[in-house]
Amino acid sequence: MENRMNFQTSVELPAGMPSVSHADHILLMGSCFAENIGRQLMDAGFQLDLNPFGILYNPLSVSSALREIIRNKEYNKQDLFAYKDLWHSPMHHGSFSAFTPEETLHAINSRLHHAYKKLPELNWLMVTMGTAYVYKQKESGQVVANCHQLPESHFLRYRLSVEEIVEDYTALITEMSALNPELKWLFTVSPIRHIRDGMHANQLSKSTLLLAIDRLQQLFPERVFYFPSYEIILDELRDYRFYADDMLHPSPLAIRYLWERFSETFFSSETKQVIVAVQDIRRDLAHKPFHPESEAYQRFLGQIVLKIERLIGKYPDLDFQKETELCHMRLNP
């Protein structure tokens, strides 16, 4: 039989990777691509904390945030600055900014302390690096996570070297391994292109990140792993129909495809079955009936409660508290 033509270059998925299950506790840090995969994991019923500092783009901001979590830092007003009617933290995404320092500090410290409490039970730390370019504040010498629209003259912008990233993360991985010997690291490079300096500079930036991660894998072969999200978008989905309107961010379809490839790499057949069961329950609850007081809908809700109880009985790590409360709220007394 004649071979069929192949119009796609397939990326070989890494073999022999440790599995990810619903019993695992996961922390995701990094760029908006970490948000994309994190939302998929959340919808699939996994236990996770997603970007407790908000979206972070460069590797040094991620490592600084992790060190502050390790130390359970308590932020105070001196860590903030006021600009354009809002109080900001240079270490945090703009989603933490607020009109008063008290509001900003409450948002920051509550997320940081929650992440600190979860550290001892973490199984996976998933880090997505977006760019090797950093902004260093001239006055303080601090690499910031977000400029918060301050004038560019306040900052020195430069590209990190492979050696800088490797040295920083070697110390961090060693420190965190001493605190949690079971912790595994999964690195990805965001497929989102940063084109401020042009495509060539973007390639140099991404290459720096890839080389640094490869070196960390060599140094920590039992702890550090890599998922080729960057390569999958650039090779398997080499078409602008897989991008959003800005032609830079992956489209929802591309994110779903990456999720499928992620699932192939890390999920057992049993885990995939649990995901289907979780999503079925949530899909049922999303159904809006015309007659919520009807006997038929009340029976339908009762069946959902039974499904939840059976699934939790088999997989006690699943969290269906919100779904159970919603069912009981809708059930007639």
Task: Tell me the role of every PLM-derived stretch.
Residues 261-333:
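Conserved catalytic region of serine esterases and O-acyltransferases that act on ester linkages
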Residues 118, 165-185, 212-225, 265:
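A structural motif corresponding to the C-terminal end of an alpha-helix
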Residues 132, 174-203, 236, 278-285, ...:
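Active-site segments of SGNH/GDSL-like serine hydrolases
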Residues 2-76, 212-215:
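Serine-esterase "nucleophile elbow" of acetyl-processing enzymes
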Residues 184-186, 207-239, 261, 275-277:
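Extracellular serine-dependent O-acyl
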Residues 36, 47-127, 131-136:
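Conserved SGNH/GDSL esterase-like catalytic core that processes O-acyl groups on lipids
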Residues 30, 126-130, 188:
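Short beta-strand segments
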Residues 139-162:
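A solvent-exposed, charged loop/short amphipathic helix patch at secondary-structure junctions
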